[in-house]
Structures are given as C-alpha cells and as structure tokens.
Amino acid sequence: MKVLKDKIWQYEKHGIDGEVELFGVNIFDYKWEDTKEIAKECDFPIYKVVIDGKEHEFATGEVSNNVWCFYLPKE
C-alpha cells in the first residue's frame, strides 16, 4: 500500500462496530472501497464510500475489539 502524503488526516471520532455516524449516516451500513492508500498521520487504510451519489473519503482502523477510530481529510 502506498502512503498518501498530499492530505492531512484529522481525528474525527471513534465508536463501536456498527454504531458510528459519519457524513450523517451509519457508516457501517455502506460498502467501503479500499483505496490501497494509507493515511500518514494515523497509519490507517483509506476508504471511499458513496452516500446519496456523493463520494466521501475516510481512514479507519479497529483499535480494540469492535472499536473503530475514524479520521477525515482536513479541509
């Protein structure tokens, strides 16, 4: 996987598997597409998801059993 250096990734939230709201929806209800890139700040894989026709990016990793940490690109 390549490390993405162009964007700065910022901590957004953490939560239990199946119960995290990102972009106004439960992110676990959507299919995540692995971009094969890594966010430098957190060393997590970057994913893309399409919600209501709009593509969003986030980085995430499971930091404990069923506990996920999410980062978003800083605007």
Regions found by a protein language model. Name each.
Residues 1-2, 73-75:
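Short intrinsically disordered terminal tails
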Residues 3-10, 24:
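N-terminal export/targeting and maturation segments
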Residues 12-74:
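Acidic, low-complexity, intrinsically disordered interaction modules
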